[in-house]
């Protein structure tokens, strides 16, 4: 495993984070959201790669390289990087990378050039009817020092600040209707708890049209009849209470991104 690179100079970062790259201020903590690419901000890209590698290694993953930067970050038509910047501490709190569906290119076989293309099969219906109004998200991270264990409000709202950025994308790109991407659960996560989350998601968020299907489906190791008996309620909210209780009993938590995505879908679908 390679050593992670040293932090990039704050002066180099500030020189690249210019006004035209600033998307907006965050709703909380007075942080700033920027959009950059490896081409227009190479030093910032290196710092993102450094911070991603540190955060992912701490969670049981990581590339093992000195920076988490791949071909999708640096290709001719690169993914854009959405980052939250703390102007007081002059450091990056977290980020996502993304690509707009209308910017996606296709290879000689007609397959989309996407970071998730080696994991999923995309139906013709998805490519035709959904991709043009979709943003693919990936590589989400919160810098280690700003994760939820940090006591001050800057750390407390780091994830909220990222949501601000995603919301702002839909304002500046009003044709966008959907986000999609993968969520990583590392092998160290409790297997029975993982199965409960997976069963719950399949029950309440099934892709009935098979818009996107995994090349290697994740198989349940637990007895499916037992899971069906456990999650026997008619509503998401009642089953969710059971799920949350079961995961906590095992000494774990529902992964924050899984939790946030599920709850955001429910809030969107509920009438106001």
Task: Cite the ranges covered by each PLM segment.
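Conserved N-terminal entry element of GNAT/NAT acetyltransferase domains
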Residues: 2-39
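Generic detection of long, well-ordered alpha-helical segments
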Residues: 3, 7, 38-49, 156, ...
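Short amphipathic alpha-helix that is part of the acyltransferase structural core
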Residues: 25-70, 80-100
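A short helix-loop-beta-strand connector motif used in the catalytic cores of GNAT acetyltransferases and
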Residues: 72-83, 106, 269
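Short, well-ordered loop/turn elements at secondary-structure boundaries
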Residues: 76-80, 88, 92-93, 130-132, ...
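Acyl-donor binding region in acyl/amide transferases
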Residues: 103-265
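Conserved small/polar residues in nucleotide/adenosyl-binding loops
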Residues: 266-272
């Amino acid at each position: 495993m390679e050593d992670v690179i040293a932090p990039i100079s704050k002066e180099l970062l500030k020189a690249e984070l210019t006004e035209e790259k600033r998307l907006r201020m965050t709703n909380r903590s007075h942080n700033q959201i920027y959009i950059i690419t490896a081409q227009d901000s190479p030093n910032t890209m290196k710092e993102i790669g450094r911070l991603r590698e540190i955060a992912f290694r701490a969670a049981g993953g990581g590339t093992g390289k000195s920076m988490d930067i791949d071909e999708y970050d640096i290709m001719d038509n690169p993914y854009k990087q959405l980052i939250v910047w703390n102007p007081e501490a002059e450091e990056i709190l977290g980020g996502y990378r993304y690509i707009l569906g209308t910017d996606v290119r296709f290879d000689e076989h007609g397959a989309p050039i996407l970071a998730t293309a080696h994991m999923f099969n995309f139906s013709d219906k998805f490519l035709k009817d959904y991709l043009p109004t979709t943003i693919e998200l990936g590589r989400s991270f919160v810098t280690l020092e700003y994760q939820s264990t940090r006591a001050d409000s800057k750390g407390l709202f780091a994830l909220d600040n990222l949501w601000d950025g995603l919301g702002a994308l839909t304002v500046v790109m009003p044709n966008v209707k959907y986000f999609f991407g993968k969520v990583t659960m590392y092998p160290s996560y409790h297997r029975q708890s993982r199965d409960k989350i997976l069963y719950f998601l399949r029950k309440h968020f099934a892709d009935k049209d098979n818009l996107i299907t995994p090349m290697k489906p994740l198989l349940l190791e637990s007895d499916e009849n037992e899971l069906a008996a456990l999650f026997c309620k008619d509503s998401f909210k009642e089953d969710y209470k059971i799920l949350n209780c079961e995961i906590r009993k095992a000494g774990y938590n529902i992964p924050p991104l899984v939790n946030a995505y599920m709850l955001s879908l429910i809030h969107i679908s509920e009438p106001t």
